[in-house]
Design a protein with these regions (language model features):
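Interfacial transmembrane-helix starts/ends
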Residues: 34, 64-81, 195, 263-279, ...
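Hydrophobic alpha-helical transmembrane segments
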Residues: 105-109, 114, 135-183, 348-350, ...
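Membrane-interface junctions at transmembrane-helix termini in multi-pass inner-membrane proteins
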Residues: 114-136, 316-343
Length: 400
């Protein structure tokens, strides 16, 4: 529960950042900022997010088995540092191609590094069952980021509006970086399966979570700067809702790491969890869509009225996407990252293909349509995996 609160605080902080940016610096800057944030989240899926999920599972197993996790920490830590440099370097030419100035490019690269380290450190702390620590530092760094944003706005430092978030994420990573579980290291600490699990997890999280970020990136690429800014107003209010499923997924991976049912939805508890979450989130998301015409113009006076239809359509797609994260997390907890990845590929390919085809023709609605259809395919695929009887001889994708 505390971990969910923590990620909710971070989501609210990110929302407030975009609201302030939109109000102070205008529609086009809002679009650029939101697109760069989506890019940072997307590239984090290419390793840091998967490394965090891997740390969450393997550190939890080592802790409960009273074994040292030094080898796992060392392996994942080095991989994180290398990937941070590579992903930041990849971000720079993309940000420049979108017409951003040096300050925004620097901020975008800094967010890529900071957010990636944040994802890894957060997953590791949840593996240690330290949800209170995670919630504390989520809150502290959110306040820090908002305070620094106020300074940037007062000083009219428009090119550097992303740096406050980058600093907040980096401070969290430093404070929560995994430093071991305290058990004495053995002469040989097995880390077999760690990178293999993480590699399949990359494919799993990209194909299941990547479409959401590609929706905003598609708007930035296929629409005018003004239309992308209007869509960003809807996107920034829709994405915090998806964090419910992401937060629950991060909690489920370590909590269910020792279950022997392979993430099956045939068990009563797992089925009730998925159905209950789907029903509860439908109520929440439905209220957001229903009240959009009232609160959007208040939050974004310049863009709100024009973004109402975009938000309502997005909420349908985000709900389908969010529900699919829960059965996927149960499968990941059982070590079935390979199956989740392969099951999600079809949805990602269909969704991304529709974005590419419909984006230039239908504008921002084309991106949302691709996201909705791709998420629906993913949901059907992971539910099918969870319901299907698993062979007794099947083994997890990694060895503890």
């Amino acid at each position: 529960m505390l971990a969910t609160v923590g990620i909710g605080v971070q989501g609210v902080a990110k929302l407030l950042v975009t609201v302030v940016v939109g109000r102070v610096f205008g529609t086009e800057t809002l679009g650029q900022t939101t697109a760069l944030l989506s890019l940072s989240v997307f590239v984090a899926l290419l390793w840091p997010n998967a490394a965090g999920n891997t740390a969450s599972r393997f550190l939890a197993i080592a802790l409960r088995g009273r074994r040292s996790d030094a080898a796992v920490n060392r392996l994942l830590g080095v991989s994180m540092l290398v990937s941070s440099v590579v992903l930041a370097a990849v971000t720079v030419p993309i940000a420049l191609a979108w017409g951003n100035g040096p300050g925004m490019v620097l901020g975008g690269a800094a967010v890529v590094v900071g957010y990636g380290l944040y994802c890894y450190a957060r997953g590791a702390q949840l593996g240690y069952d330290r949800a209170p620590r995670v919630a504390l530092w989520d809150s502290v760094t959110s306040v820090l980021a908002l305070g620094l944003l106020v300074v940037a706005c007062v000083a009219r430092l428009e090119p550097f509006v992303l740096l406050p978030l980058a600093i907040g994420y980096t401070v969290f990573a430093i404070a929560c970086w995994p430093r071991g579980n305290g058990f004495p290291p053995a002469s040989h600490e097995p880390a077999a399966g760690v990178l293999g699990f993480a590699a399949w997890n990359v494919l799993a999280v990209v194909t299941s979570n990547g479409l959401l970020q590609l929706t905003m990136i598609s708007a930035q690429v296929t629409s005018s700067a003004h239309d992308a800014g209007v869509y960003a107003a809807a996107f920034t209010l829709a994405t915090p809702a998806s964090m419910l499923g992401q937060a629950l997924g991060q909690v489920l991976v370590p909590a269910f790491a020792h279950r022997t049912d392979g993430g099956s939805l045939r068990s009563r508890g797992a089925l009730l969890l998925v159905v209950g979450f789907a029903a509860a989130s439908a109520v929440v998301f439905g209220l957001v869509a229903l009240l959009a015409g009232w609160f959007l113009p208040i939050v974004y006076p310049a863009e709100g009225a024009a973004a109402v239809a975009d938000l309502r359509y997005l909420m349908v797609a985000v709900w389908v996407f969010t529900v699919g994260l829960v059965p996927a997390a149960l499968l990941l907890a059982a070590g079935r990252s390979r199956q989740v990845a392969l099951a999600s590929v079809a949805g990602f390919v269909v969704g991304a293909g529709l974005m590419a085809v419909l984006g230039p023709v239908a504008g921002v609605a084309g991106g949302t349509t691709g996201f909705l259809v791709g998420s629906a395919v993913n949901l059907v695929a992971v539910v099918g995996l969870g319901v299907r009887r698993r062979s007794r001889s099947a083994i997890p994708d990694s060895i503890d």
